[in-house]
Every structure is written in structure tokens, then in C-alpha cells.
Amino acid sequence: MRDYETGFRIKEALADLVFPRRCPVCDEIVPMGDKLICSRCRIKPQYIREPRCRRCGKQLMGENVEFCHDCMQRKHAFDYGYALYDYQSMRKSIYRFKYGRRCEYAKFYAEDIREKLSDEICTMDADAIIPVPVHVSRRRSRGYNQAELIAAELSRITGIAMHEKLVQRIKKTVPQKELTIQERQNNLKKAFHISTNVVKLNKVILVDDIYTTGSTLDAVAVELKRRGVNVVYFIALCIGEGM
């Protein structure tokens, strides 16, 4: 093992002693010997499995369709993507991660993404990982961008470079969960800005915590493709059910 890897593991072990890791599912301190999640909680997350929508990755109820109802009704700017969990099974976990400063959950989420979606990520063959940005005021009040924490861990374990400053959110928008689909699209017009030339990036993976309608990912994908990116994939932690 290389010296820096040994040092990294020692630092992690010391940090765990001073600030014990909490299980991302039950939020209890993870027992010594367990990894990033309690052994009793390992079976609780509900993963999105086949059949999945070929565009947004929602779990489909039927075997004879390729796309969910939402994706058959509207065209997306992103090419396709995947979500890891069914939203309801990890709703409380994501809430604590997003609003309760449980930043340490990011490592578990990223490791789980790699374990469950490794083949899909390899097939994407992306040049970069890009976290969906939050507005500077929201980042200041929250203290971090939850998507960037996941993206950073995913970049570390996959070796795909993260470009966290490439996309900026320049418009302070109303929270998307309060809006209809049309309102979401209008809310995000001119919300994002590409800060540098991206012509050298051919394929990228956007990373976000929750996929609802895809409006945010669409808005970012439009700007990236306008600046020369050819293919925009995404990976989200959670997504709802499809039809």
C-alpha cells in the first residue's frame, strides 16, 4: 500500500474515533467493525432495479414499456441517467444529509453508487463529473452543496475528474418542490451559467440528490450542450416511481 493511502486510512480511523460515523439510514453511531452503515440497516434501502425507464431511470411497473409516462410526455435535454434509491425508502436519510449537516453520508452514498451502478458508469465513459450547483446564498446558509459532496466522493473512487466550478447557479430560484412542471421550467430559465470553455469535454455526468421531473438537469444540460458538450448523463441518489 502506498504511503499516502496508509496516511489517508490512519486519518480516517482517527477521525472516526473523535467524530464517530453515523449510519445514513438510522442515524445511530455505526458500531466498530461495521463499515459505513449499520449491519442491521443494510437491507433497508430499496434500490431501483430493472425494468427502468431508458431515459430517467425510474422503476417501471410494467415489463413491456421502455419509457415512463413522464418521459413519453416530454423531451429531455439530458441523454439518460440512473437513480440509486427509491425516494421513499431513503427520504429521511436524504433530508438529514441535505438539511441536518450529515456530510459524512456522502461517502456511503458514493460507495453504494459505485457498487450498484459500476457497469453503467463504465459504459458512460465520461470525461467529467459535474455536481448540480446551488445558488451562493443557499450554499452560504446551508454550509455546503450536497450534490458536490457526493460528486467529490464519486470522483475520488472512480478516478473521473470533478469539475465543480464549471457550472454556476446565478439565479436564486424558488424551491422546485413547490412548483408545477411548467413553473419549474420557467423558474430555471437563465438560472445557470457555464464559467469556462467546455469544448474539450465530450461526455459528462451530472450528479444530484433527488430526481423529480428532471427540469433542473434539463436546464444544466441545455447550457452544457450549448457550449459544446455532446452527451450529458446524470446520476441521482433518489427518484420516485414511474408508470
What are these regions (language model features)?
Residues M1-D208, T212-M243:
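Glycine-rich phosphate/pyrophosphate-handling loop used in enzymes and phosphotransfer proteins
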